[in-house]
């Protein structure tokens, strides 16, 4: 529990210090990325397809590998670039593309398990469905596709039950994570994608996280 709070505080700090948006998105996916890394074998790789969660990935990389998250922010900005030395295995940001790289890496090395995280809004991209179809039709067993189902796309809400039904029809063992972008009073709905924290927001967020301890 304490480690979980420290990770959230670090993510909050990174967003505030760097005046970065996508706060709600990053908090919705933080636990997923953390949980995946906690269970990965030494040779496994993680690919973040929804690149706007870059800050969440940096915080988790810092936790597990001791690589400074602020250094990753300075080097990559909000969306990660390929940097295998620092545990970033694919450039992402253009939605729907990194999952195709994940499929390729899984096919290229069956001895490795590839974990890839996509977002619900990202499922508007045709390459997502092509990738899921390919995984299923070719029975690729060493790739795990995770979906951050926070219910909010770039400009509108997501029909979650309908999307889950469609995703599972393409890939029955796809892993759905039901999350939310509304982690603090200043993060609500679509605005949680684009809100940039003020000092008051940051202090309120720290207070709420301290109360969770």
List where the protein language model places each region.
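Conserved thiamine diphosphate
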Residues: 142-177
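N-terminal capping segment at the start of a domain
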Residues: 2-20, 148
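Residues that form generic nucleotide/phosphate-binding pockets
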Residues: 10, 14, 60, 205-212
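Active-site metal-binding loops of divalent metal-dependent hydrolases
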Residues: 117-122, 149-151, 179
């Amino acid at each position: 529990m304490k480690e979980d709070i420290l990770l959230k505080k670090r993510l909050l700090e990174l967003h505030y210090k760097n005046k970065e948006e996508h706060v709600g998105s990053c908090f919705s996916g933080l636990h997923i990325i953390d949980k995946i890394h906690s269970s990965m074998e030494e040779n496994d790789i993680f690919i973040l397809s929804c690149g706007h969660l870059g800050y969440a990935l940096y915080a988790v990389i810092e936790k597990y590998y001791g690589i400074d998250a602020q250094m990753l922010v300075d080097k990559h900005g909000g969306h990660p670039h390929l940097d295998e030395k620092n545990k970033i295995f694919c450039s992402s940001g253009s939605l729907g593309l990194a999952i195709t790289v994940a499929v390729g890496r899984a096919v290229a090395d069956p001895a490795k398990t590839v974990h890839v995280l996509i977002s619900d809004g990202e499922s508007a991209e045709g390459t997502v469905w092509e990738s899921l179809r390919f995984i299923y039709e070719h029975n690729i067993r060493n790739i795990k596709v995770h979906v951050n189902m926070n219910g909010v796309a770039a400009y509108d809400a997501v029909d979650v039950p309908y999307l889950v039904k469609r995703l599972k029809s393409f890939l029955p063992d796809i892993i759905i994570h039901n999350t939310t972008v509304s982690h603090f009073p200043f993060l609500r709905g679509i605005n949680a994608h684009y809100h940039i924290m003020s000092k008051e927001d940051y202090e309120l967020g720290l207070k709420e996280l301290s109360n969770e301890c």
